[in-house]
Amino acid sequence: MGIKKFFKIKPPPEATPEENREYLNELGISTKTTPSNRREKFAAYGKFANDKVKSKVYAPEGYEQYANPGAQPSERQQLDDLNNSPYDEVSMINNRNASASARHTGNYVDPYSNDNASPYGNSDSSPYGNASASPYDTGYNAPLQQNNNPYGSMNNSYSNKSYGSNSYSGDTYASPSPQASSSNNNGATGQRPSNPYANMNSQDPYGTNSYSNSGSVNAYKGFTPNVAASDVSSRSYASPRHSTSATRSNDREFNFERSGADDEIDLNETIRPEIDNPKGVQRNGNGDDDDLNNSIHENEGIGTPAKGYQTFEDIQKESQRAEQQEEDEEVDGIKQQIKFTKQSSVASTRNTLKMAQDAELAGMNTIGMLGHQSEKLNNVERNLNLMQIQNRVADDKVSELKKLNRNILAVHVSNPFHSKRRAREAEDKIKLQRMQDKQNQEDITSTLHQSTKRIENAMSSGHGPSEVRDRYQNQQILEKAKRYQFENDEEDDEMEMEIDKNLDKIGQISGRLKKLAITTGKEIDSQQDRIKRIEESTDDLDIKIHVNTTRLTNIR
């Protein structure tokens, strides 16, 4: 039975962290305190860096979404997804219902059906009628065709049109009727026909124009029927097949009265250049085109008739006018080129300014994250310094414990004559150690202050431009831009000012980028030195803790 158990001696109760901290403070030993009023200046950049970090998912390819099913998308991802809309599901349901209901109606259009682009359907010029003969023109659930027989249409030229005047009916021997000819030739009143024999009916079956009475077919504007041709065609439908010979004999008769009336020229009629001379052909004063017996001096001095020749002055004026026009066109081209170049310069400066601003923002984010990293390194240095102080106290306590735990017969008595000197040496040692600890703390604080000041100076944008400076700067820009301007207007001045200001901003941003780059390099070098010191202090502290642990295990 041991003495401790015999006398019922129990170890003292373990002190709480608060009691231990108060006891260490009474002894003059530094302890860790967490002030509530301390704020980190670059905490926002640390949160920004944490948001940018992507969590590693160890899952096979294609199964990443099942590795962490409870994870919710971040707030930034939700903000960046501009395609999400609360009405997407509603619109999808409505579109699905609309497409389902359209399939049961007759107006449904199958997107996979062939378009009705058959050359044999829906045209009067088709010999197969209006109905499309293609079996692929009908789509899924499309309404049925009324008549799918390609030879049963009402407009079939082989069943309804026989020797009609329509050129597309296939009869090249059909000639226009007198009524159609008169209606076509007398359409423009007061105009003298260029061919006096155009109104005569041709006796040659091959001389008639098979396309004169037919409706004009335009591939882009549809089919425009001719009224006269339709009348003749309708009459030809009613006439029997054997009546064509009588019609041809009647057409051979020449109507001299009508032809003479068409050939008469009204000499009292006023000359209208836009009708008689549509193409700007020069004529003499009498209005005759082919009369070579007229004198060029016949109407000289009467009004201002058109001359049949050009004088030297007219030729010179015309050449000057042409040169002036060419010069004006060249000037206009140069103006357009100048304007286009300035607009391109404005766009280039805008793009460059935007990229410079993005680079500056990225640099500021980088140096801000370096500031947050500096604050974290400062916390590590403070904790490491406190660990060194407490490890030194632990070393003293281990030595004292070893002295108290030795044999009871080993009596240790200090020299009473040196007591004052020992006390003085102990006080000096405590003072020196305390001064050294405070110096280490001040160095750590000074390093953090220098790093923070360096980063804040790099992130400061400087003073903004004042109104007076802007006003005088605008005047200076306009004065300097006059040598690059030609007939400048307000828009031109605005482009010049924008180009100059954008270039000025780009220069300022370039200077700040250089400052950010230099500061970032200095900060990285400083933090590398601090990390090296932390590594060395950590290794030294690890060795000391290991020695104290070994000494405690050797105490029996």
Swiss-Prot record:
Name any GO cellular component annotation: SNARE complex
Q: Does the keyword Magnesium apply?
A: no
Q: Which UniProt keywords are present, listed alphabetically? A: Coiled coil, Protein transport, Repeat, Transport
**GO-annotated biological processes:** exocytosis; protein transport; vesicle fusion
Q: Which CDD domains match?
A: SNARE_SEC9C, SNARE_SEC9N
User: Residue ranges of the t-SNARE coiled-coil homology domain?
Assistant: 339-401, 493-555
Q: Which segments cross the bilayer?
A: none
Which cysteines bridge via disulfide bonds? none
Q: What is this protein called?
A: Protein transport protein SEC9
